[in-house]
């Protein structure tokens, strides 16, 4: 059985950095505009992999523009399965959302260096992932359909 255990935002959706564990009860409270719906939509995106059905009002920025405003904006999903944990890195490349899979638990040091500086260059991130986890990230997956096929078989 697979389950989403954690979601991480890095320079995404007006959130500089956030890790939210999802493997137990989660209760979101707060005033209007603090990010409750933002987090819930990102979780929903994991399950349906389509920015169209997220309930984002037409007068607001679209999913891509809001969640990935910078070249170093990422959402990382950590997924538990029977034989371990893997991560899905969602980011924007050449103006499109793309996914990369890493067969290892999330590590903040892959993306963030000294002084809390987020790495800009994917080559640097890829190097840090392979160096610390001993595994290479997958190639870019660039379609929602292929992402769903990989996740759900």
Predicted features by range, described:
Residues 1-152:
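Extreme N-terminal "head/tail" segments of very large remodeling/mechanoenzyme assemblies
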């Amino acid at each position: 059985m697979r389950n989403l255990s954690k979601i991480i935002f890095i320079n995404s959706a007006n959130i500089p950095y956030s890790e939210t564990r999802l493997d137990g009860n989660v209760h979101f409270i707060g005033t209007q505009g603090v990010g409750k719906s933002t987090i819930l939509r990102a979780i929903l995106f994991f399950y349906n992999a389509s920015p169209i059905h997220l309930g984002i009002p037409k007068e607001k920025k679209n999913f891509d523009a809001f969640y990935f405003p910078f070249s170093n904006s990422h959402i990382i999903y950590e997924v538990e399965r029977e034989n371990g944990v893997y991560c899905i890195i969602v980011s924007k490349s050449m103006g499109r959302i793309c996914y990369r899979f890493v067969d290892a638990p999330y590590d903040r040091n892959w993306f963030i260096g000294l002084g809390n500086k987020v790495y800009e260059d994917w080559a640097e991130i890829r190097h840090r992932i392979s160096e610390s986890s001993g595994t290479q990230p997958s190639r870019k997956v660039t379609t929602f359909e292929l992402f769903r096929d990989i996740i759900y078989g």
